[in-house]
Amino acid sequence: MTWVECGKFASMQERRCLAGLMLTIALMCPLLSWSQATVKGFIRSKDSGEPVMFASVALEGSSRGVMSDIEGFYSLTRVPAGQYTLVISSMEFEGVSEVVDVLDGKIMTRNYFLESKVIQLGSAEVNADRQEQTTKVNMSIETIRPSDLKKIPSFGGSPDLVQALQVLPGFISTGDQGGQLYIRGGSPIQNKVLLDGMIIYNAFHSIGLFSVFDSDVIANADVYTGGFSAKFGGRISSIMDIKTRDGNKKKIQGRVGVSPFGAKLTLEGPLKKLGTGGGGISYILSLKHSYLEQTSKVLYDYVNEDGRGLPFNFTDAYGKVSFGSGNGSKLSLFGFNFSDRVNYQALSDLGWTNAGAGGNFTVVPAGSAILMNGHFAASNYEIRLQEEELEDRFSSVNGFNFGLDFKYMLGENAVEYGLEVVGMETDFQTFNSIGVQVGQKENTTEFAGYLDYRINNGDWIINPSMRMQYYSSIARFRPEPRIGIKYKASERLRLKLAAGLYSQNVISSNSDRDVVNLFYGFLAGPENLQRNLLTPSGEVQEVNHSLQTAQHVISGFEFDLTERFNLNVEGYLKNFTQLTNANRNKLFEDNADNADVPEVLRKDFIVETGIAYGADVVLKYEDRSTYMWLVYGYGNVDRWDGFRWYDPVFDRRHNVNLVVSQGLGKDKAWEVSARWNLGSGLPFTQTQGFFQPPNVVDGIATDYVVANSEELGIQFAGLNEGRLPAYHRLDLSIRREFEWENHTLECSAGATNVYSRDNVFYVNRVTGERVDQLPFLPSISLDWRF
């Protein structure tokens, strides 16, 4: 169905609202470019050409001051005419100053290249974080930088984003082997992952301990666990916005790493060296490959009783070329191919691939104070599960997305607005436990526009925003207002609040009742959906659309105990007003012959509602050589399926994460890190007994004396009314760097599950066999940089 065809079914009022938003956004550019004096530009590293993030930029003799963003861009607006000294300072780079003559109504561009300097470890990040906390609402957001990844003991000695995510507030992992990440009551499909603006449909490998991203190419990752502004949409729980860095524009560099779990290679360098006026062309290439299935048979044959080791394999390739211009405008083109394969004892074979290409760009108009960013991308994701004596399961997503974002600084205030288009074709085919086919093929396109205004007014920071979302396949228009507020009660105490409406039109083939299910398929806007839902009050609620929807309310405070000790407390409520789940109760085909059969027995998908609430407490300390991160999370997730309230399999009541990293030695060349995790037991459905189902294939003529069934029936207890034992695990690592000439060798040793805690993963109901999560796994890794 095309956009024009869908428009025929949208109401006149909805089309007028959407058209009005588009017109308003289009008119913002000239309105915001009115005659003012503006000083803007980019700050980059003189050594590599990379952006200098979070540098302080100020005009001496005035109240004007800002920080550079993750692209190194700064903009000082509403500057009165006159002569000033422009001062740039950074904890990582040597500062610079320049006398500038600001003319009334003129826009002045000044780009700077800063030289690196020796700094105290962590001081730059501490300073940048403190600045961010006093100028932005920053509700339920955690920023992960490359330096943060190294502070967490890593599985196999190689830092990985997924291991950093697991220690963030609100994150729950259901297992070391095939577990998924759940964020503040939201399931994995309700979490959007963006790579340089591109939607990544499966960002984590089946083993659950590795992501598809190479930590060496990550520049910054912003993780929003709720209450995010209108800039982001299409998901109802969380956003992970990951940015990659450009290759070195001055010299060729490389990195080779090996461990018992896998190997990786990173190469980067200039295709056209960075000149004195900027510009330049660079590349960066990354390749990761796991050989864990082979090495685990020798080194970790004790993991499984059959000695087969760990049956997980994956390969990730990524490449990027960046073109820069003298005025700071930039174009980057990238491509990737991620693959994953799991082979369980020759009984099942699961594999998926995710390949795509895209680009992003930054445009700095010479006569405007507006910064324009854009992205475009297309990808294909396919997953297939083959099992003995069962039909194959298959799912695919062919998708594209395009977006434009505009940013304008109004003194200490900021306006952001933009447009986004997302399209996808989904194909999904599977079978339930009794062999009934469940599947659908869909095409959908989403159109969105947003306006985000951040107001800094004394002690108040107010961030209202509005997102207009149109789902063309179902002709559904949704205005989604959002708000963020922060009040600076004192120099050390800041109170904050956020709320908003959210929606999405994509679901997962997994049910939230599945304990383990590596088959992760996608479907957009399912049509075979029940049309009535019995509410907890006994009323029948009509289901008039297939969207998943939610409301967020989050409040909390930040308190600076000292200059390096910070306390952050947040309480959250996510009201999931409509959820879609795979129907595990389907017994009949949905056709005219079965029209009298209840919908819950013939529809492919069912509708649920839910509520998630809890609180997260984060205590952080960081100085030159010591890093400490302590998180306690309390959470409660309840779902209503039209029959009962139940706890989904990821409903963990208590969760604790402690990370400690300590530099040792005169030059702090040694670093010791530890992570301890404690989680209360997850829900599961208990087995009450077994029975032999009667065989009545011949109806009333069946001879019940001899017609015994060969099948085994299971009598279940209440849905997820039981609780597994508590989970806890200690990981340790130690690393040391050796430098000579232009080479660095990093040696690290570590262990996962140091005291080999037997954490239960699941129990086979029929055989009673218990499957535990990963035992004690030691490792040594080498990393050579040149």
Which sequence ranges carry the predicted segments?
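A beta-strand signature from Gram-negative outer-membrane beta-barrel systems
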Residues: 167-168, 212-253, 264-266, 273-275
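Periplasmic N-terminal accessory/gating domains of Gram-negative outer-membrane beta-barrel systems
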Residues: 101-106, 123, 127, 131-228, ...
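Gram-negative outer-membrane beta-barrel transporters
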Residues: 456, 572-575, 587, 594-683
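Transmembrane beta-barrel wall of Gram-negative outer-membrane proteins
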Residues: 261-291, 302-341, 349-373, 408-415
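Outer membrane beta-barrel strand-and-loop segments of large Gram-negative receptors
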Residues: 403, 442, 446-450, 542-546, ...
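C-terminal beta-signal and adjacent terminal beta-strands/loops
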Residues: 677-711, 723-731, 735-786
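Periplasm-facing N-terminal accessory domains of Gram-negative outer-membrane beta-barrel systems
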Residues: 34-123, 127
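Surface-exposed extracellular loop regions of Gram-negative outer-membrane beta-barrel proteins
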Residues: 382, 427, 472, 492-552, ...
